[in-house]
Structure formats: structure tokens, C-alpha cells
UniProtKB/Swiss-Prot annotation:
Residues 896-940 have a biased composition (Low complexity). It comes from Mycolicibacterium gilvum (strain PYR-GCK) (Mycobacterium gilvum (strain PYR-GCK)). Keywords: Cell membrane, Membrane, Transmembrane, Transmembrane helix. The chain crosses the membrane at residues 18-38, 63-83, 114-134, 176-196, 211-231, 260-280, 288-308. This is UPF0182 protein Mflv_4654.
Length: 1004
């Protein structure tokens, strides 16, 4: 057989080449044009914020990694192809005129340069794109330092695991991929160019093909040997099924670890054997080496550890794993900030009795009992404080603390009155109006969380709504700032609500007469012109064209509203702004507003995390931070695994000009220290946090939820007890009937558990249940006070003390409470909603459960039917208190005098200039007086609306007397139904009582 002559490939015409070139340019523009536009816009945006160095550092790092990886991988693949081509046989026999390999060879030879360069280039570019996404790993390797703590197995500083090992793994992976791709390219090249022939019984392999392929296989084996070496270190942070802890256990240390060394030695021996085939010319040797390595990995790497696990460990697991569990306990506490320096454990009875005098003396707690639930009162904020259709409050409000006029620490429900572009209507949605007129919100609203305005005995009475302190631009153009702190600039251009709309940009700046809607007087509308430093100038045609392309909006080019003074505000979400200037941070899901130095700022908590801290428990953020609030708001954390977390950064975003400021909260964090080397001057030292800002820094919710989930296990000191799980705790489920997940932690002002001196403290708290039980096991409090910030106090509760679910069940099924609430909410006339169930340490070793109860007319969530506080229910030990106010409930529970230091309702008056309203068209009947609970004196009963007619000397008509007898008979029937436990009879008795009361009221 002779070599088939090469067929000539058809050539392209000049026109075809031109069309192909034009098409290629258009495709590149479509693919790369938006990327270049976004890059230029980001360059402008980072420069406006003063963080351009962050942007350029990222870009340069990504580009360097891209080119390094692309060149290395592309060069290795190119070398594999080039060697196959350069060492091809001079004469290649064909299998006949229809030999498919000959046809492919002809096609390749006709486009040899295109294929020989294009294929490695494409593979290199793809590898570069993937590689540049690991820029953070590279920067940590370059700038990481020591932790000052060594791992318990190898004695290596933890900085190696945090910063070095991930980089080595990355390099090893790319080397392995590059060599493997070179092997495939070389194999395919030799086959195509005739170095490998499969014709005949045994085929043929050229000497060059044998040397090159064997060399590449040997390199792969050497790389595998290096991988086995690094596998040893990764054992300390991996998890294996059946272990109750993270990290290397008995089997890992005594079987897997030696197996890795044995496999490494076998891989080296096999690599030497493979290389020897170059000289021995026996391909069976590399084949045997590959098979030996595979069998060894199965027998030594998997089989032997399995035997050790089943025969040696399983029968004596607690004792065998004891040493390694101790390692995990120590490491997890270090990694999650749960060491003795941060956590204080105290025994707490949980069921101690308390007198009225003791309760009253517990002023820091009783005067701050929270009755406003930030997850329920948002409709009331909307009803009374919205003002305009385009202003908006989120469904879940926030908690913060301020000092009142007397200097007492109080917690407040706070909200910023933001602009919501999605609520604009009709011509308000016009491009000019949406982006140049309706540009900002106006106002900071705060309500004392321990009181309401007036008493609402039923949801149709005036009262029971929050007391609003609204700091806004008033009708006279002046800033009205009644509290809780002085505010000079209430306008809000940056916030999560305004950023939730698509194309959230606003165009501001001097354009002659003011254009931006600001406020209204009695006669007209007043506009405003933004004077802040924030915003990217768009006065020239280049930037106007760029933003026109970015937002696909021609008005950037043709609108006369935009002039040389115009600026564009965009990327207005506070958390997104922080994540952009600090891409190495994971931010908390909750962003909250505060008045600091007479300005509204958004405070964002930032976390540094690792996922390979030796022996530390591996947690999934989205799982351990989920609670009923997050589920209701569909606001979940990243699905990210961590084994180390620090609240290393506190960030603020100015609500007016968007300025982002990063402060180092944990300056000892090695991860933060590394990033501060990467981005010098981007994070300010902790000493720059002003006292005014420090007073509003909260212990972050997500970190607390992670820590309470870990404390549920890692409060245990004894490894044998840990292994048995007998002393574990559980995060309780939210007992609220409308909840579907874990109970969230609550911010409260109560007595200081960190200092234990009776003073008021702002803290984040959570109850903990016994493992798979509903009894209380512990109470966790994290201090947010400047002096004791970050200190966790854990009150461990022995015995069988009611947990949140048992307490809520006892309260909600109490005869008096269920009777009255059933009457108020009967037939859907009113909707009853239970507020958050708070757990408060009270007296000398007791726990008080407090649940506010709200009601709104009808059974919908319409803003016009906002919920009012109608009752407060409490439980202490097994006793229940109930009343329209905290004072009434305390008196009912503990007796007269218990309410001496409690906060009562404020005087009923029209909120924010509005007249008192009676909502709804239905008038609910007055609730009948429920019978007293057995064993409780009626003296402490709160006054509730009662339809019982007057008694005494008043002379009644015959009809009135008959109606009175019907009421008494109905009450007797109700008592009988209660005693019988027949719910159907009980419902009929309630209806009969209601009819009798109505008849009595209508009778003259």
C-alpha cells in the first residue's frame, strides 16, 4: 500500500473571507462589548467611592492568573501536539482508498497552523477563564501569615492550611489537567500522523510515540504521588460518614494516613517503572504500573481503612475516638469564637419563685419588656407613616437601641422610609419621573418597643399602635427630629428597598430649577436638588453613551435633563456596595439603619470565613442560619460551607451619599490581616470607630445563629459524653402557629448578664432545648454593649423547665385566654396574630415568657387593617398572666406591685398628625368576661371589655331584666361547657352568650 496523495482543500473567495471576518468581529463585539462596558462602568463606580485600587487589584490579579494559566496549559497542550507532529513517521501506509484516518490527516495538514495553534489556544483560554476565578486563593497565598496555633497532628501552623494548602492544591490540579490534556493531544496526534497504527493483529507504535506517551504517564503518576502527600493534611478537615465530628478520627490517623504514605511510595515506584519502559521497550511495564496503582488505591486506600473501622473502631468507638473528639472540641471552639475568653457558662435554676417586689426590683428587664414585634408592626408603619404611595417600609423591620430623655437605654423598632420605584403609578413611571424626579426616600421612623399608644380592647378601638418618632423633612422644609436621636439629613438615596427595583439608578445634579420630589406644603409640592458627593458624573458624551448602552436607554443621549452637572446614582443596595468594595467578605443577611452623628447610615456586618480549619466542625451557612423570619422573607444566607468564621468587619453605608466605610472589628483575625495586605488602606482600624457608631453596633444575627448551632454540641467537654450525644441541645422550633422553621434569636434590652450587675444591656438572645425534647436546656445571650461587646453568656438550666413550645402551648390553651381570643376572632371578624415569644431571665433564677397578641379587623394582611396590640400574655413557672398591657399581665401573674417599674401605654393621640381611626365596617361585639382560671385570685385580673350590665340600685325595666337573665344563663352554660370539655357545646355557648349580650345592649 502506498501513501494516498493529499487532496486539495477548496479555497474561500475574497468575499467569503470578508463576510467571515465581519461576522467574527460582530460576534466578538456581542460577546465582549457588554463585558468592556461593565468594566468601564465599574472603574468609574469604584473611583467615585474611593476604592479604585480594589478594582484595579482585582483586575490585575485576574489578568495575571488568566495569562499564566492560559500560557502554561496552552503551552503544555501545544507541546504534546507539536512533538507528535515533529516526530511523525516519514512514510505512513494507508489502509486503502477509503481510509478515514487519511482523510482526517489530509484535512489537518491543510489547516495545520490553525489547528496546531487554535486548539491549544482555545484550551488555554478556557483554562485561564476558570483559573482567574481563583484569584482570592492566590492572593491569600501571597499575603497570608501565621495563626500562632499549630494543628494537633503534624504540628504545623494553621496558616499553612488556611493560605498555603489550597494554593498548592490549585497548582497541582492545573498541572494534572495540563499533563493529562497533553497526553490526550499527543496520543491523538500520533494516531493521526501515523505514530500509532491499529492495523493488523498487534498494531504498531513508533519509538517517539512510545517515549512521549510513557513520559507523560510517568509525570501523571508523579503528580498523583504529590497529591497523596497533600491528602494527608486534608484529612484533618474532612468529614466522613458515621463520625459525629469533623477531622481525622482513629481510622484516619491509624489506617488512612499510613495508607496515603504507602500509596505515595507505590505511585513513585510505578512512575519509575513506567519511565524504565522507555529503555526496556516493554509496554507491559507501564500497564502493570497503572494497574498496580489502581489496585493499591482500592486495597490499601479503601479496603484496609474499612477493615480497621469495622473490626477495631466500631466495637469501641467512644474510647477509640475520644482523643480526636477532644481535638475537634478544642478546634471548633477556637474557629467559631467559642473559647473561654468569649463564652461564660453559669448554672441557672430557671424555675425559682419570684415575688412582686423582686419583679419590680428587676427594673432593667421589666421596664423594657418588648411588646412590638418588628415582623408584625410593619403595616402600622405603612398606615401611619408612609405618606405617599411610592414610600415603603419592608415587611420585616429592625431593632436598635437609643437613650431616652432620661438617659435610660431603650430598644426601638426602626425603619427608613425609602422610595420604592415599583410602587410608582401612571405617569410616575415615565422615565423622566422615575429616574430624575422620584429619586429618594425621606425619614427615619422609630418606635419604642416597650410601649404602644393607648389600649385597644379590641381591634376596632383606637389604640394599640406604635408610638412613632418620625425624623423627616417637614412641611416647612425644616427637618423635624423628635428622636430617638437628632437627625440633620433624613433624605435616603441608598437602601435595600430602592435597590430592589430593576434599573434602580437615579440621575441627580443641578439642572436649573430643582426637579426631585421632596415634600409637600399645604398648597404646593417642593422639589430638591441632590448636593451629596456620591454619584458618577455623566456630563460628557462618552459616559452618557456608555450608560445608554449599559441600560439600553436612549434617553441618556437625547434627554435635556442631563447636563454637565448631572451624576448617576446606581448600585444602591448597602450590602451589595460593601461586597463590591470588599469581595472577600460574606455579609449578614440583615442590614439595619441607624442615626450616627446626625446622619442615617446602613450598618452591615461582614464575615471572613474558611472551610478547611483542621478539626473544626464544617457548617453550611444557609442551613444553620435558617429560622422562621428568614423563611418568611425568603432571605437565606449563601449555601456555603465554613469551618471558621469571624465578624471581622463592620461596614457603614451613608444613606445620603452612599459612602462606604469599612472598620476592622476583629483586628486579630489572620484572614482579615491577609486581606488588609492585599488591599491596603481599604479597611480602617478599629480605633476609628466613633463612640456614636459603637453605640449602634449589634452582635450580628447570622454569626449568633451559627454559634448557637455549634454550642448545641460543643458546650460538652467530655468526649465520651459528646460521642453519646446525650447532653446535646437543640435550637427550638418557633412555636408561633404561622412559623415553619427554627425560632429566631431576639434583640432585647434587659438586665446585663455579661456583667451580672442589674444594669440594662442590649443583647441578642436565644433559648435552647434539650436534645429532641421540648424542655429548656440553656439560655444564650450575646452582649452588644460597647464595654462587653461579643461576650456570650450561657445560662445552663437543669431539670424539666418548660421550653418555648411548652410555654406557648400553655399560654395559648389557657382557658381564659383562648376563650377571649376565640370571641374576638370568631367567624373571621378579626385576625389574631401572636407576636414573638420572648424568654427573659427574671428575679433570682426564674424565666419569664412574654408573648404580645395582636389583632386586626378582617382576615387579610391589607395595610389598611394593620394589627394592634390587644393583649400581653406571660408565663412564669407554671403560672400565667394576661392583660391588655404589660402592667396588667405582670399584676395578674405576680400580684399587686409587680408592675411598679414596668412601662405602661402612652396616651392615645393621633399619630403623625392623623386623626384617630376606627377601622373596618364591622363592629366586633365586646368580649365577654371569661371565667377566672382555677387557682388564681381575680384581684389581679386585667380589666377587659365586659358586656355585663350594671348591678346595684339601678332600676331595670322588665325587658332589660329578662335580657339580663338570658346573659346570666348564657354565662352558666359557658361555664358548664368549659367543665365538660365539649368544644362543640363550648362554641354554641359562646354564640349564645354573644346573642344575649347584644340583646341586652339593644333593650331599653
Amino acid at each position: 500500500m502506498g501513501m494516498r496523495p493529499a487532496a486539495r482543500m477548496p479555497s474561500l473567495t475574497q468575499r467569503s473571507r470578508f463576510l467571515i471576518a465581519v461576522s467574527a468581529v460582530l460576534v466578538l463585539l456581542l460577546l465582549l462589548g457588554p463585558r468592556f462596558i461593565d468594566t468601564y462602568v465599574d472603574w468609574l463606580w469604584f473611583g467615585e467611592l474611593g476604592y479604585r485600587s480594589v478594582f484595579t487589584t482585582q483586575i490585575i490579579t485576574r489578568l495575571v492568573i488568566f495569562f499564566v494559566v492560559a500560557i502554561l496549559v496552552g503551552a503544555v497542550v501545544f507541546a504534546g501536539l507539536a512533538l507528535a507532529y515533529r516526530t511523525r513517521p516519514v512514510f505512513v501506509p494507508t489502509a486503502g482508498p477509503n481510509d478515514p484516518i487519511a482523510r482526517y490527516r489530509t484535512a489537518v495538514m491543510a489547516r495545520l497552523r490553525l489547528i496546531g495553534i487554535g486548539v491549544p489556544l482555545a484550551i488555554g483560554v478556557l483554562a485561564g477563564f476558570v483559573g482567574q476565578s481563583y484569584w482570592q486563593r492566590v492572593q491569600l497565598f501571597l499575603h497570608g501569615g501565621d495563626f500562632g496555633v499549630s494543628d494537633p497532628q503534624f504540628g504545623i501552623d494553621l496558616g499553612f492550611y488556611a493560605f498555603d494548602l489550597p494554593f498548592y492544591r490549585l497548582v497541582l490540579t492545573y498541572l494534572f489537567v495540563g499533563v493529562f490534556l497533553a497526553f490526550l493531544a499527543n496520543l491523538l496526534g500520533h494516531y493521526l500522523f501515523g505514530g500509532i497504527r491499529l492495523a493488523g493483529r498487534s498494531g504498531a507504535l513508533s519509538r517517539a510515540a512510545r517515549i512521549q506517551l510513557i513520559t507523560l504517564v510517568g509525570l501523571l503518576m508523579l503528580l498523583k504521588a504529590v497529591a497523596y502527600w497533600f491528602d494527608r493534611y486534608e484529612l484533618l478537615s474532612h468529614t466522613r460518614g458515621g463520625k459525629p465530628f469533623t477531622g481525622a478520627g482513629y481510622t484516619d490517623i491509624n489506617a488512612v494516613l499510613p495508607a496515603k504514605l504507602i500509596l505515595m511510595a507505590i505511585a513513585v515506584i510505578c512512575a519509575v517503572a513506567v519511565f524504565s519502559a522507555i529503555f526496556l521497550r516493554d509496554l507491559r511495564i507501564p500497564a502493570i504500573g497503572v494497574v498496580l496503582l489502581l489496585l493499591s488505591s482500592l486495597v490499601v486506600g479503601a479496603g484496609w481503612p474499612l477493615v480497621v473501622e469495622q473490626i477495631s473502631v466500631r466495637p469501641n468507638a467512644a474510647q477509640k475516638e475520644s482523643e480526636y473528639i477532644s481535638r475537634s472540641i478544642t478546634a471548633t471552639r477556637q474557629a467559631y469564637g467559642l473559647t473561654e475568653e468569649s463564652v461564660t457558662y453559669r448554672d441557672y435554676p430557671g424555675n425559682a419563685s419570684a415575688t412582686a417586689q423582686q419583679v419590680a426590683a428587676d427594673r432593667a428587664t421589666t421596664s423594657n419588656i418588648r411588646v412590638l414585634d418588628p415582623n408584625i408592626v410593619a403595616p402600622a408603619f405603612t398606615q401611619f407613616q408612609q405618606g405617599k404611595n411610592f414610600y415603603f417600609f419592608p415587611d420585616q423591620l429592625n431593632m436598635d437601641r437609643y437613650r431616652d430623655d432620661s438617659g435610660n437605654l431603650r430598644d426601638y423598632v426602626v425603619a427608613a422610609r425609602e422610595l420604592n420605584p415599583d410602587r410608582l403609578i401612571d405617569n410616575q413611571r415615565d422615565w423622566i419621573n422615575r429616574h430624575t424626579v422620584f429619586t429618594h426616600g425621606n425619614g427615619f421612623i422609630a418606635s419604642p418597643a416597650n410601649t404602644v399608644r393607648g389600649i385597644a380592647n379590641d381591634p376596632n378601638q383606637n389604640g394599640g399602635y406604635p408610638e412613632f418618632l418620625a425624623s423627616v423633612v417637614g412641611a416647612n422644609g425644616e427637618v423635624s427630629s423628635p428622636g430617638p436621636a437628632p437627625l440633620a439629613q433624613p433624605r435616603i438615596y441608598f437602601g435595600p428597598v430602592i435597590a430592589s427595583a430593576a434599573d434602580d439608578y437615579a440621575i441627580v445634579g443641578e439642572s436649573g430649577t430643582p426637579r426631585e420630589y421632596d415634600y409637600e406644603t399645604n398648597t404646593d409640592t417642593r422639589n430638591y436638588t441632590y448636593t451629596g458627593s456620591g454619584g458618577v458624573p455623566i456630563g460628557n458624551w462618552l459616559t452618557r453613551s456608555v450608560f445608554a448602552a449599559k441600560y439600553a436607554e436612549r434617553n441618556f443621549l437625547f434627554s435635556n435633563v442631563i447636563n454637565e452637572n448631572s451624576k448617576i446614582l446606581f448600585n444602591r443596595d448597602p450590602a451589595d456596595r460593601v461586597e463590591a468594595v470588599a469581595p472577600w467578605l460574606t455579609t449578614d443577611t440583615t442590614v439595619y439603619p441607624a442615626i450616627v452623628n446626625e446622619r442615617i447610615v446602613w450598618i452591615v456586618d461582614g464575615y471572613t470565613t474558611l472551610d478547611n480549619y483542621p478539626y473544626s466542625e464544617l457548617s453550611t451557612l444557609s442551613s444553620v442560619t435558617t429560622d422562621s423570619n428568614e423563611v418568611a422573607q425568603n432571605r437565606l444566607q449563601l449555601d456555603k460551607q465554613v469551618s471558621y468564621i469571624r465578624n471581622s468587619v463592620k461596614a457603614t453605608v451613608d444613606a445620603y451619599d452612599g459612602t462606604v466605610t469599612l472598620y476592622a472589628q476583629d483586628e486579630q483575625d489572620p484572614v482579615l490581616q491577609a486581606w488588609m495586605k492585599v488591599f491596603p488602606d481599604s479597611v480602617k482600624p478599629k480605633s476609628d470607630i466613633t463612640p456614636e457608631l459603637q453605640e449602634h453596633l449589634r452582635y450580628p444575627e447570622d454569626l449568633f445563629k451559627v454559634q448557637r448551632a455549634l454550642l448545641a454540641k460543643y458546650h460538652v467537654d467530655d468526649p465520651v459524653t459528646f460521642f453519646s450525644t446525650s447532653d446535646f441541645w437543640d435550637v427550638p422550633l418557633d412555636p408561633n402557629p404561622t412559623a415553619s422553621s427554627y425560632q429566631p434569636p431576639y434583640y432585647i434590652v434587659a438586665k446585663d448578664l455579661a456583667e451580672n450587675n442589674g444594669s440594662a444591656s442590649f443583647q441578642l438572645t436565644s433559648a435552647m432545648n434539650r436534645f429532641r425534647r421540648d424542655f429548656l436546656a440553656a439560655y444564650i445571650s450575646a452582649s452588644s454593649d460597647p464595654e462587653t461587646y461579643g461576650r456570650l453568656t450561657v445560662l445552663t438550666v437543669p431539670g424539666q423547665v418548660n421550653g418555648p413550645k411548652l410555654a406557648f402551648n400553655a399560654i395559648s390553651t389557657d382557658t381564659a385566654i383562648s376563650t377571649e381570643l376565640g370571641q374576638i376572632g370568631r367567624d373571621g371578624q378579626n385576625r389574631i396574630r401572636w407576636g414573638n415569644l420572648l424568654t427573659l431571665p427574671m428575679g433570682d433564677g426564674g424565666l419569664l415568657y412574654v408573648a404580645p397578641i395582636y389583632a386586626s379587623p378582617g382576615n387579610t394582611d391589607a395595610a389598611s387593617t394593620y394589627p394592634r396590640l390587644i393583649r400581653v400574655a406571660m408565663m412564669y413557672n407554671d403560672q400565667i398572666g394576661y392583660g391588655p398591657t404589660v402592667r396588667d399581665a405582670l399584676t395578674d401573674l405576680f400580684g399587686p406591685g409587680a408592675d411598679a417599674t414596668a412601662t405602661g401605654p402612652a396616651a392615645t393621640e393621633p399619630p403623625a398628625g392623623q386623626a384617630p381611626q376606627t377601622q373596618g365596617n364591622n363592629t366586633a361585639p365586646p368580649a365577654a368576661q371569661p371565667p377566672n382560671r382555677q387557682g388564681q385570685a381575680p384581684a389581679g385580673r386585667p380589666e377587659v371589655p365586659v358586656a355585663v350590665p350594671p348591678t346595684g340600685p339601678t332600676q331595670l325595666s322588665a325587658a332589660k331584666s329578662a335580657a339580663l337573665q338570658d346573659v346570666n344563663a348564657a354565662l352558666d352554660a359557658l361555664r358548664g361547657a368549659q367543665e365538660s370539655g365539649d368544644f362543640a357545646q363550648y362554641g354554641e355557648a359562646l354564640q349564645r352568650l354573644d346573642d344575649a349580650v347584644n340583646k341586652y345592649q339593644e333593650t331599653d
